[in-house]
Amino acid sequence: MNRIFKTLALAAAITAMAVPAFAAESAPLHQTVKSPQKLEVKSAGNEHFTGEVVTAALYGPQAPSKSYAATVTFSPGARTYLHIHEMGQTLIVTEGTGWTQEWGKNPVMLKPGDIVRCPPGVKHWHGGSAKMSMTHIALSEAGGTVTWMEPVSDEDYPKD
């Protein structure tokens, strides 16, 4: 009987040591630093954007976190189509000037340092100004969908 208890105790101890080892493999237990020179910059395409837009992923979701971030640069006049984020979105303007607009409301000019918090379910668009490019960091959560809608027409786009 003692032998069974010793075997069970040993098995429990080995299991207890193994669990943290597996957890460490799923997420690094140290800080990571990524140089901007190593970011992959790519075109956002024209499926959901008007004008030239480029993106660079800063980081992806890593369990248990669901957050991810990217830089997005809009050339002058470039903008997103109207869209809705199921999980919401935060934008931090880092360069240039641009616009954001909730459906049915007046456009709001954006400048470096501005932080836009768009709650879940709010129909909106954002982009560069007519005369100047804009770069922002976009922060979102994985697991939610983005519902893309119609483009913002030249008539509805602010002319600075």
What are the language-model segments listed below?
Residues 15-22:
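C-terminal segment of classical bacterial N-terminal signal peptides
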Residues 80-82, 100-101, 123-129:
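Short beta-strand His + acidic residue motifs that chelate non-heme Fe in jelly-roll/DSBH
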Residues 1-9:
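Bacterial N-terminal signal peptides that target proteins for export
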Residues 104-121:
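Short acidic-glycine-tyrosine-enriched beta hairpin
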Residues 71-75, 84-100, 139-141:
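Short, conserved beta-strand element in jelly-roll/cupin
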Residues 22-66, 146-160:
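A short, N-terminal "cap"/entry segment at the start of jelly-roll beta-barrel domains
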Residues 131-150:
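A short hydrophobic beta-strand segment most commonly corresponding to one strand
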